[in-house]
Swiss-Prot record:
Belongs to the FGAMS family. It comes from the Bacteria. InterPro entries: PRibForGlyAmidine_synth_PurL, PurL_linker, PurM-like_C_dom, PurM-like_C_sf, PurM-like_N, PurM-like_N_sf. Pathway: Purine metabolism; IMP biosynthesis via de novo pathway; 5-amino-1-(5-phospho-D-ribosyl)imidazole from N(2)-formyl-N(1)-(5-phospho-D-ribosyl)glycinamide: step 1/2. It comes from Corynebacterium ammoniagenes (Brevibacterium ammoniagenes). This is Phosphoribosylformylglycinamidine synthase subunit PurL. The gene is purL. It is an enzyme of class 6 (ligase). It holds the Pfam family AIRS.
Length: 758
């Protein structure tokens, strides 16, 4: 059976034919613009290509006008670190000595709601291929997860499937999962967030970019065969929110094969080493349509593609289906004719399917696609790649003043009971139920991962040079004040890297928001972008790349605005990375609190746990103080252990440092704040709890003073196994038991964990 195509000639002959542009996610004005570009109606294949490439996911059409602010705030000094920046598959930074690091965060939110396991698994696979496409070896992954209420039935369906998908794919690839964050909130019910981060390493001279150059060069498709999975994944899932009772969108969810990707990684690295690749692009969202049109648009000529040569795993696929398929584990390379044979030999060695599917031509800005010997696409690739740019209206919501009114702070009858309630809350409880499903130490280069502020990896076995990576974000803070919320996410990720002893070096982000057609959401988005861009400039670290995910809402209710910020740091010797846990030295430790504590409970976990809702202003952060903390920790060998203060404040930081070794801690809250509740649970920014041996105390206090960092001795450790404060006492083991039980009790017997949404 031969598929009948809608050809270019047929499109010219049938100008009045009705087309399903709306079902493909296009607006009337967008369809009209396509007709204007082509001078005729588009073919089915052209309509598919434009709908995919003009989706929010691929075109950034609603966010692009605001994202330009990142470029406007990047100084020459900041830019000098970047080898590849915004617009590439992933940001790449030069960290000196000929080494480069690439890292990026990508969202796979909507697919993970529809089919949790495959949605999350292919999210990991996609971000890993982004890193591969830069010429790098992927070395680790992280994940940022957001779910509905922890006790909601649908959370019990989604969370176990997502966690299994992340672990199943990442573990099979042999990549350590070195950290992450899991948050529960009502706003994510029906729209979970699954943001995956990957980091890779390469030599500076091995950098690869996505472009098709050189007349006569061949376009090679390699990896898995192309099937029907993921058809329309970008345009259907990336540009639509979930309505109550809406028909499930399972056909648009991709299916991953991590073992095929593991082989593809090694195949790519050998192809790079052999010098046979001119340009490279992974096939992710938008599939072959996206990969080939982007390569053509970035080159100095044109491209001809023959879909008859694409290896298929389904029969009778149309041109539109082949172009839009989001089958996983595929890459597209541009190769000179004299290297094609070598390219094929390497692919054959790794048992990777490859095919020559096209050629670079000297006809600039042309993109021709043939199927069954017929021309089905004839369009300028620049118009496909650039897409429309919208100046969406935005306005500060009327409810913003009301939500920022000073909250009434709940006062507990017992501080000990409040402490127990905090550590056992889903917001702060142990994530071991999740993280124990991930392999943290595969490959043997993980230095810090479990219960660490950031993941630390060795990247050079000879010099012990390494990197530290952290990713953070607070939707609660960002809803109260989007600009400050983004700054706080940046500050926490920066601080998490700094407390390991690494020097923060670069930033990436994943901006998760509701519908861009909502003026409130667009105001939140603009404010968050400005907060992150201005904050990065103040810290003098560049934003190397990012991702935007819109339409995260159920019906008309958007999620909490959630900018996830990743920070990469460099450490000269990973063996000198600072410890997280107390009890690591053979004598009592003195505890020192760096930074100033204020009564700041807006958006805090205490406000959430005590039933205070979401009210007030978030903590205020002066990023100059974060930079001072980084200066304090770099090269500091006097610190025995360190932990940043964030969610839950001093109490949670002290418990998390003490629990592993069952250390006793005696805290003096009076030197922190006159109010014991504030001293325990305030979430003031720019604070770190450190410990040191007594003979290093004076030197540490002097160093803090020289840098202008407030520092007070807040306590000491002992072998009692109890945490004492304000005349109260609670056993560390009792807190640990409550802390450890929450997630297993909620999800240990979840039913239907991998079922699709009905």
């Amino acid at each position: 059976m031969t598929v009948s195509n809608d050809t270019v000639d047929n499109a010219k002959a049938t100008p009045e034919l009705d087309q399903p542009w709306e079902e493909l996610g296009l607006k009337q004005d967008e369809y009209d613009k396509i007709v204007g570009i082509l001078g005729r109606r588009p073919t089915d294949a052209e309509l598919t290509v434009y709908s995919v490439m003009w989706s929010e996911h691929c075109s950034y059409k609603s966010s692009k006008t605001h994202l330009r602010y990142f470029g406007e705030t990047t100084t020459e000094e900041m830019a000098s670190k970047i080898l590849a920046g915004i617009g590439e598959n992933a940001g790449v930074v030069d960290i000196g000595d000929g080494d480069a690091v690439t890292f990026r965060v990508e969202s796979h939110n909507h697919p993970s709601f529809v089919e949790p396991y495959q949605g999350a698994a292919t999210g990991v696979g996609g971000i890993v291929r982004d890193i591969m496409a830069m010429g790098a070896r992927p070395i680790a992954v992280m994940d940022q997860l957001r779910f509905g209420p922890a006790d909601a039935p649908d959370t019990a369906r989604v969370l176990p499937g997502v966690v299994s998908g992340i672990g199943g794919y990442g573990n099979s690839l042999g990549l350590p999962n070195i950290g992450g964050e899991t948050v529960f909130d009502e706003s994510y019910a029906g729209n979970p967030l699954v943001n995956a981060l990957c980091v890779g390493t390469l030599r500076v001279e091995d950098l690869k970019l996505a472009f098709a150059s050189g007349t006569g060069n061949k376009v090679m498709l390699f990896g898995s065969r192309t099937g029907l999975d993921g058809i329309g994944g970008v345009s259907v899932l990336g540009s639509a929110s979930f309505e109550e009772g809406e028909e499930r969108k399972l056909p648009a969810v991709q299916v991953g094969d991590p073992f095929a990707e593991k082989v593809l990684i090694e195949c790519c690295l050998e192809l790079y080493a052999a010098g046979v690749v001119v340009g490279i692009q992974d096939l992710g969202g938008g599939g072959l349509a996206c990969a080939t049109s982007e390569l053509a648009a970035a080159g100095d000529g044109g491209m001809v593609v023959n879909l008859d040569n694409v290896p298929l795993r389904a029969e009778n696929m149309s041109a539109a289906e082949i172009l839009a398929s989001e089958s996983q584990e595929r890459m597209c390379a541009v190769v000179s004719p004299d290297n094609v044979e070598k390219f094929r030999e390497i692919c054959e060695k790794w048992d990777v399917t490859c095919a020559e599917i096209g050629e670079v031509t000297d006809k600039k800005d042309t993109y021709l696609v043939y199927h069954n010997g017929e021309l089905v696409v004839d369009a300028p690739p620049s118009t496909i790649d650039e897409g429309p740019v919208y100046e969406r209206p935005y306005a500060r919501p009327q409810w913003q003043d009301e939500i920022q009114q000073a909250p009434e702070i709940a006062r507990p009858e017992s501080l000990v009971q409040a402490f127990k309630d905090m550590v056992s809350s889903p917001a702060l409880s142990s994530r071991a139920f999740i993280t124990e499903q991930y392999d943290r130490y595969v490959r043997g280069n993980t230095v810090k991962a479990k219960q660490s502020d950031s993941g630390v990896l060795r990247i050079n076995e000879e010099t012990s040079r390494g990197v530290a990576i952290s990713a953070d974000g607070s939707g609660r803070y960002t809803k109260l004040d989007p600009n400050m919320g983004a700054r706080l996410a940046l500050a926490e990720a920066y601080r998490n890297v700094a407390v390991t002893g690494a020097r923060p070096y670069a930033v990436t982000n994943c901006l998760n928001f509701g519908s861009p057609e909502n003026t409130d959401v667009m105001w939140q988005f603009r404010e968050a972008v400005h907060g992150l861009a201005d904050g990065s400039k103040e810290l003098n670290i560049p934003v190397s790349g990012g991702n935007v995910s819109f339409y995260n809402q159920t019906g008309d209710e958007p999620i909490l605005p959630t900018p996830v910020v990743g920070v990469l740091g460099v450490i000269d010797d990973v063996h000198k990375a600072l410890a997280h846990d107390l009890g690591g030295i053979d004598e009592p430790e003195t505890l020192i609190l760096l930074g100033e504590t204020k009564e700041e409970f807006g958006g805090s976990i205490w406000q959430q746990v005590s039933g205070g809702g979401l009210q007030g202003l978030p903590p205020q952060v002066d990023l100059a103080n974060e930079a001072k903390l980084a200066d304090f920790f770099v090269g500091n060998t006097s610190v025995a252990a360190s932990h940043d203060l964030s969610e839950g404040g001093l109490a949670i930081a002290a418990f998390e440092m003490a629990q592993k070794n069952n250390v006793g801690v005696d805290l003096d809250l009076s030197v922190v704040h006159e109010d014991a509740l504030t001293a325990l649970f305030s979430e003031s920014a720019s604070r770190v709890l450190i410990s040191t041996a007594s003979d290093h105390l004076d030197g540490i206090l002097q160093r803090a003073s020289e840098l202008g960092i407030p520092a007070v001795v807040v306590g000491t450790t002992n072998d009692s196994g109890n945490i004492t404060f304000a005349g109260e006492e609670v056993a560390t083991a009792e807190l640990r038991e409550a802390w450890s039980a929450t997630l297993p009790n909620l999800f240990g017997h979840a039913v239907g964990a991998n079922s699709v949404v009905e």
